[in-house]
A protein has these predicted regions:
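Basic, polar low-complexity surface loops/patches
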Residues: 1-197, 201, 205
């Protein structure tokens, strides 16, 4: 790890910082670096995930014997607190939820999924809905929460999630168009449609 990644890892994992730039007179201008043994990397990754960090795994993507110059490396996997599936990084007997909240025009919907088990729950609210959303967040206690702009702008939801639950916050993309979202749901669950004559507004919030 290098630069700011190295500084963060050094602080959070009690690792010694070093540098290759010994020839640079000013220590502040040297590139900090640190690392861990490959065989024990999972232990260190688990500690970072437990502290709420995202971890990107990079590996060589070409044979060093045939590479010209520096061996190419690329990100092959990103692990986040809400997307962990490795049993060694999960607390035994405790759910590990990834949450999502969508708020728009007086309506809110929340979804929670434990990717390691496949458990999935959704709920939609109208009217005085913030208290209901906070109750659901407190009940499921997600490790990571994805929000749309409407949910983030309430301030109440991100503050509660971050300060009370200590979960990692992520902003969802701008594309919450209903038709596109419904198509994804139909493809995932092998449905012809998600139309309903009842609870139409709640359903649309949930789909988004």
């Amino acid at each position: 790890m290098f630069d700011e990644d190295a500084r963060v890892a050094s602080r959070e994992l009690d690792l010694a910082l070093t540098t290759r730039d010994r020839s640079v007179a000013d220590p502040e201008q040297r590139t900090p670096m640190c690392g861990v043994p490959y065989h024990s990397s999972q232990t260190y990754i688990a500690r970072l995930i437990a502290k709420g960090y995202k971890v990107a795994i990079c590996e060589q993507i070409e044979d060093p014997a045939t590479a010209k110059g520096l061996v190419k490396r690329d990100v092959i996997r990103i692990i986040t607190p809400g997307t962990v599936t490795d049993a060694a990084m999960l607390e035994e007997g405790k759910s590990n939820y990834l949450g999502a909240v969508y708020c728009e025009a007086g309506k809110c919907a929340a979804a929670f999924c434990d990717i390691s088990t496949g458990e999935f729950c959704v709920a939609a609210f109208e009217g005085d809905n913030l208290s209901h959303v906070l109750n659901e967040l407190g009940r499921f206690a997600p490790r990571e929460l994805i929000m749309n702009k409407g949910a983030a702008e309430t301030q109440t939801i991100p503050d509660f999630a971050q300060k009370k639950l200590g979960c990692l916050l992520e902003m969802g993309g701008d594309d919450y168009e209903y038709t596109a979202c419904a198509a994804i749901v139909c493809e995932q669950f092998k449905l012809n449609s998600v139309r309903s004559e009842e609870h139409t507004s709640e359903l649309q919030s949930l789909i988004r």
